[in-house]
Amino acid sequence: MTSVIFMGTPQFSAPILSSLIDNGYDVLAVVTQPDRRVGRKHVLTASPVKQVAVAHDIEVLQPEKISGSSEMARAIELAPDLIVTAAFGQFLPTKLLKAAKVAAVNVHASLLPKYRGGAPVHYAIMNGDSETGVSIMFMEKKMDAGAVLAQRAIPITDQDDVGTMFAKLSDLGRDLLLETLPKLLAGELTPVPQDESQVSFSPTIKPEEERVDINLSARMIDCKVRALRPFPTAHIYLNGVRTKLWHVTVLDQKTDLQPGAVVSRDKHHLAIATGEQGVLSLDELQPAGKPKLSITDYLNGTTDALTVGEQVAE
């Protein structure tokens, strides 16, 4: 039986761990981030990966930082055949990677060398890409730079957001890993080095990047809204109030009004001008301090005039 140490944290990683367990791999231990307080009530919550491990009585290691930790020493002591990572969220020291007797491999949610880094799904949607995918690659000290063992692509639809794509890519990564590991163990794969001239990066989204530039085209604003939904969520300032954008629609029309101006409005509809003469319907909003609101509920509750031509969004 092939022994594995699995390293991962979010929901993306949990089905991948479950599949290894269900398919006869001997998971010696799971390394995941420490429990975090979540939600308005700040409830201390185990990561999805830890929850799977606990359910199967697998040893759980939770270092705040893996490098130099006692948890790293324990992982090295276990001497697994494979180290498998999926969205673990930390750099792994070379000493740890070399503890794997066969290989240390990573399930990365992009078509490498495109979108190395921590937010590949967000960037694929935000940039309006028509497809993304999963890469299974050797791990090395440099971030997401190892030779690729397998790749598979899937389309990004106009309805997809980061939530739906994470779910699709998790399933894809699970299936591709299960196909790849037996071939790796049998020595049947030829690793393909990444083309360094094609490398791009997807660093973690910063809070200031969550604000929508109303001068972008309507399509690119829609892409940004979907790329940041359900987390961390895009926002604009609507009549001076920070307002999250949950759902918008690109309208098939043009306007000469300045970006941020009201193009049309009735009891159930509000559309604003964007860059490149675009028009964007605001369908579901969340003003600061309030719950999500349909545009109908928002318009019923606002005292703002929101008249056609009025500059309201920035």
Curated annotation (Swiss-Prot):
Function: Attaches a formyl group to the free amino group of methionyl-tRNA(fMet). The formyl group appears to play a dual role in the initiator identity of N-formylmethionyl-tRNA by promoting its recognition by IF2 and preventing the misappropriation of this tRNA by the elongation apparatus.
Catalysed reaction equations from the record: L-methionyl-tRNA(fMet) + (6R)-10-formyltetrahydrofolate = N-formyl-L-methionyl-tRNA(fMet) + (6S)-5,6,7,8-tetrahydrofolate + H(+)
The name this protein goes by in its record: Methionyl-tRNA formyltransferase
Gene name as annotated: fmt
GO function terms (MF aspect): methionyl-tRNA formyltransferase activity
InterPro entries: Fmt, Formyl_trans_C, Formyl_trans_C_sf, Formyl_transf_N, Formyl_transf_N_sf, Formyl_transferase-like_C_sf, GART_AS, Met-tRNA-FMT_C
Sequence positions that bind (6S)-5,6,7,8-tetrahydrofolate: S110, L111, L112, P113
Enzyme class: transferase
Keywords, comma-separated and alphabetical: Protein biosynthesis, Transferase
Matches recorded under HAMAP family: Formyl_trans
Protein family (similarity comment): Belongs to the Fmt family.
The protein's Enzyme Commission number: 2.1.2.9
Any one GO cellular component localisation term in the record: cytosol
